[in-house]
Amino acid sequence: MPKYTGPLPGSDFARQVAGVNLPPFRGTISGEVVAASGGYFTLGVANIRGKIVRVVASVSTAGKADSQVPTGTFNVRINGTTALSTPPVIAHVSGEAAQHKTTWSEAGDTGITQAVVNNAACDFGVGDILSWSFAYTGSDSPTAKMANPSIVVETDPIPPV
């Protein structure tokens, strides 16, 4: 059945509907992490044309070590091609407790790098596969381990032409 293309109530109607019907893609690795995750994990398959607009990464515990700072680097791919020009990074900061951290800009956490979406590589089509990875670097036996790395990939639809 062909997709209905209009007339629509407004120029941003598809975005409004997608905001309700297209929740963000989400992924989590449950538990403590002290080694690379071992590859990419599927976030889902796109059911509409769209683009990635924001990526937020979080950990329930950022880890702690006196040497070799625990650091987690995230990445997002569309059909195997990275969609980020700068991946989000969460790192322990000396003197801080092993605490929850997020790259959400409003949180104001320290030791983080916010994701920058590559506008030349962020579009996806129906059937495209979105995936993510998490890579840990730092001490193999930290005082506190990094735990529960999670990612939220927010998208907007691309209106029909």
Regions found by a protein language model. Give the residues of each.
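Surface-exposed, low-hydrophobicity beta-strand/loop segments enriched in small/polar/acidic residues
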Residues: 5-8, 12-161
